Amino acid sequence: IIYMKISSKEDIINHFINGNKSDLYIGVENEKFIFDTKTQKRSTYIQISNILKFLQSNFGWEKVIEGNNLIGLKLNGKQVTLEPGNQIELAGAKLKNIHEVCAESFEFQDQLIKACNEFNLELLSIGYDPYTNLKDVPSNPKKRYEVMTKEMPKLGRLSLEMMYQTSGTQINLDYSDEKNFSSKFKLISYLVPISIALFANSSIKEKKFCNYL
């Protein structure tokens, strides 16, 4: 991590100016829940490991190992990673337009569905897990999540729910100058509340109605 010392307004402005790019790309990260079709419970680390091994064997992904544990995959600028509650995330490659992003997403989803079918698992593309109690979400051996699980509650009472009970989407956009940045930032500011209402809102929490639409 590179920390930037901020001592003036100009330091902040220069940080964004230094981010100007001539070649503009878009990258999308999205997470998905995996459930066991027999037990209707969230997938365990062992089950997710089987998925990763299947993807590696059948679609050319390379393993990412931490200690003795398989924690992800990589291929052509893309990465598959494990989130704290064994959500699977695709961190996409840098691409030129949303059509390429869409194709990348559907290709990985097709691979993931094939892997899930092999192990009696099911993919669920929603923003919040409405069924599983926080204490019942299976964990995995990634070291950073062990630290985060201890430290995050100090920063917010819903931090563990965010880690273990949500699946998010993150969009990374390059910008060419201040005007280009402003137009993209403005548009995203309009779209995010709508997308949250549509895709990340849940009327059910841990199998009970929670008075949200």
Task: Cite the ranges covered by each PLM segment.
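Terminal catalytic/cofactor-binding subdomain
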Residues: 3-157, 165
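Loop-rich catalytic cores of soluble enzymes, especially ATP-dependent carboxylate-amine ligases
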Residues: 117, 128-213
